[in-house]
Regions:
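A bilobed periplasmic-binding-protein/Venus flytrap-type ligand-binding module shared by bacterial periplasmic
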Residues: 135-140, 179, 254-267, 286
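A ligand-binding cleft/hinge motif common to bilobed small-molecule-binding domains
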Residues: 91-95, 218-239
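C-terminal motif of bacterial Sec signal peptides marking the signal peptidase cleavage site
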Residues: 19-23
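Periplasmic-binding protein-like
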Residues: 130, 158-165, 191-194, 200-201, 236-263, 277-300
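Extracytoplasmic ligand-binding site segments that recognize negatively charged/polar headgroups
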Residues: 38-45, 67-68, 74, 80-216, ...
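Bacterial signal peptide processing site
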Residues: 25-27
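Extracytoplasmic "Venus flytrap"
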Residues: 29-47, 62
Length: 338
């Protein structure tokens, strides 16, 4: 049986869902916000339900992927009907920011999130976080045999033994962090090693399933896919464990899910309230107490008790505004991974 998260992952993208309404009418009346949502749908629905209950402001959302919706916003420019953009990863936020499409956030919203989880520009903010991990099959690898660094995976001894989903924005964000931290030459070499010796999978779930089934010894994914399956059926994670690279390794990259307000929005006050709520204690407790298993980023809100605390991950310092999605696409295409 496929897990609930597998079914969610299979839902067709780019559909418009309406909260508290029977039909979607774009950005609608003065109290209704339109969110372009690339974050997981179930989490955003929890945020919207809680926000509408507290404020009475109705919210609609258009579901899609990071790259898809980011490119759509850039194409729409000042004519976009969107009021808010939410993503799973930072590169799409950086692309929209570089296009000059974000409005400044209120200082009150910005101050709720520590500097390491938002860009210094104040054009958008982190709303959640997820960490890179190496999921490994416990029957194939001991802890002593695990790679010290994610960079080790391009070495000959790992050929054919690991995999990842290069077509997904999640993995591309990891490569963007690698590019920022190690430079173009090292990143290109690593991608060439992946092409020569890594197994290619459709997404994080398929990667984890392949590790669990013993198709590969290990795989690079985001942590919460493992925790979600562990909390449900353990169908695709029962034979696996997680390895955290730590030591400020590129493989310890913590990816920031972002939220920003579009300059073109005619409902900036309501949009500010929405982002202020998401990053408030009440909004972040949805992460702490829910089953998304993503990390809260607001000050004073701990992670779900099942997770390793963020401060213990020893993540490298990365500037989220400088995660270069276009350069990553170019490098991955040149390596034959896209």
């Amino acid at each position: 049986m496929r897990s609930r998260w597998s079914r969610i992952a299979a839902v067709v993208s780019a559909v418009t869902v309406v909260i508290g309404m029977t039909a979607c009418s774009g950005s609608g009346d003065s109290d209704e916000l339109l969110v372009y949502n690339a974050q997981h749908e179930s989490l955003t629905k929890e945020w919207i339900d809680a926000f509408t209950k507290e404020t009475g402001i109705k919210v609609t959302y258009r579901q899609g992927g990071d790259t898809e919706l980011g490119n759509q916003l850039v194409a729409e420019g000042d004519s976009s009907p969107a009021d808010v953009f939410l993503t799973e990863n930072s590169p799409a936020m950086a692309a929209v920011e570089k296009a000059g499409l974000f409005a400044d956030l209120d200082q009150g919203t910005i101050s709720q999130v520590p500097p390491q989880f938002r860009p210094a520009t104040g054009k958008w903010t982190g709303v959640a976080a997820r960490t890179t991990v190496f999921a490994y099959n416990k029957t194939k690898l001991t802890e002593a045999q695990l790679p010290t660094s994610i960079m080790d995976l391009e070495k000959p001894e790992w050929k054919g033994r690991w995999g990842a989903p290069p077509v997904k924005p999640d993995f591309q964000a990891i490569v963007a962090a690698m590019l920022q931290l190690t430079g173009e030459a090292a990143t290109a070499q690593w991608l060439a090693g992946m092409k020569a010796g890594g197994q290619i999978f459709q997404d994080n779930i398929a990667t984890l399933r392949a590790v669990n089934d013993g198709q590969v010894d290990g795989g690079v994914i985001y942590h919460y896919y493992w925790f979600r399956d562990q909390a449900e059926t353990k169908e695709i994670s029962n034979n696996t464990a997680l390895h955290y690279f730590k030591n400020e390794d590129p493989g310890a990259f913590v990816s920031i899910s972002g939220g920003g307000i579009l300059n073109s929005s005619k409902k900036k006050d309501q949009a500010q309230k929405f982002l202020t709520f998401i990053t408030s204690k009440a909004g972040q407790e949805v992460l702490e107490n829910g089953t998304s298993f993503e990390y809260p980023v607001a000050s004073g809100v701990p992670a779900n008790k099942a997770l390793i605390p963020l401060e213990q991950l020893q993540a490298p310092a990365v500037n989220p505004s400088d995660l270069d999605s276009q350069k990553v696409t170019d490098l991955m295409t040149k390596a034959g991974l896209l």
